UniProtKB/Swiss-Prot annotation:
SUBUNIT field: Homodimer.
Residues the record lists as binding substrate: 80-82, 222-223
EC numbers, comma separated: 1.7.1.13
Listed name of the protein: NADPH-dependent 7-cyano-7-deazaguanine reductase
Gene encoding the protein: queF
Organism name: Burkholderia orbicola (strain MC0-3)
């Protein structure tokens, strides 16, 4: 299914009852082919979706609320278009379920089917909301740099690294809050923070920040932008290890946080940032 045929940017009709058919899958293959990925993936990872507007009725008709987190594997053939996800979650509002576990099971079944892979689902009920953390991405801020730039479309030529043959490899974690891209269907801006951890030749910090800023007028889904960042850094800077993690601000009660890496490591922290 193409994004142009999704509910995004169209008049909305809100379902009165639970409806799994509202989920609109979008194949990853098209965007990945544009990045030159036609066979085995050069990374693995997860897309972490947090849903803050989930509610349903218990068997006695009393509303229940929860925050849901979905872990979608990067190797899944599809992503779910975000507005369709919002409408799907909204369809739970007037439907009765026996328990929180029953809701979780339905969410896992439906979203896994739409994505074409097993999706993990966690629900946090209202009585546990106080346990949820807020934190900023760890790392050295690139935004501290005072620089000029005038490139606002992705330009990998801005990236460079030290000569790997003559310089010792370094290990760094770098962060920026200046990531912005735009929805390819509606043109609405998507605001994000990005964390880049690598081992390899020293990456030029000013060039990396200019590169991140260069996404400012780019149109692409969150997942596609992170994969492009990963591939451009791999090609231009040739790190031995690389992990890219972005946390985008929420829209329609959902935030999307893609993570891509080429080495084994724990799942990144899902603590929301202040802007989320």
């Amino acid at each position: 299914m193409n994004p142009e045929h999704s509910p995004l940017g169209k008049a909305t009709v809100y379902a009165a009852q639970y409806d799994a058919s509202l989920l609109f899958p979008i194949p990853r293959a098209g965007a990945r082919e544009q990045l030159g990925i036609t066979s085995a993936l050069p990374f693995f990872g997860t897309d972490i979706w947090n849903a803050y507007e989930l509610s349903w009725l218990n068997t006695r008709g009393k509303p229940q609320v929860a925050i849901a987190t979905f872990y979608v594997p990067a190797e899944s053939p599809n992503i779910v278009e975000s507005k369709s996800f919002k409408l799907y979650l909204g369809s739970f509002a007037q439907s009765k379920f026996d328990s929180v576990d029953a809701v979780r099971d339905v969410l896992k079944r439906d979203v896994s089917a739409a994505c074409g892979a097993s999706v993990s689902v966690q629900l946090v009920s209202a009585h546990d909301f106080a346990k949820l953390e807020m934190d900023e991405l760890d790392g050295l801020s690139l935004d501290r740099l005072d620089l000029d730039t005038d490139v606002y479309e992705p330009d990998p030529s801005l990236l460079s690294a030290a000569d790997g043959e003559n310089e010792a490899p370094v290990e760094e974690t770098l962060v920026s809050d200046l990531l912005r891209s735009n929805c390819p269907v509606t043109g609405q801006p998507d605001w994000g923070s990005v964390q880049i951890h690598y081992v390899g030749p020293q990456i030029d910090h000013a060039g990396l920040l200019r590169y991140i800023i260069s996404f400012r007028n780019h149109t692409g889904f969150h997942e596609q932008c992170v994969e492009r960042i990963f591939l451009d850094i791999m090609h231009a800077c040739k790190p031995v290890k690389l992990a890219v993690y972005a946390r985008y601000t929420r829209r329609g009660g959902l935030d999307i946080n893609p993570f891509r890496t080429n080495y084994n490591q724990p799942m990144p922290d899902n603590a929301r940032t202040a802007r989320q």
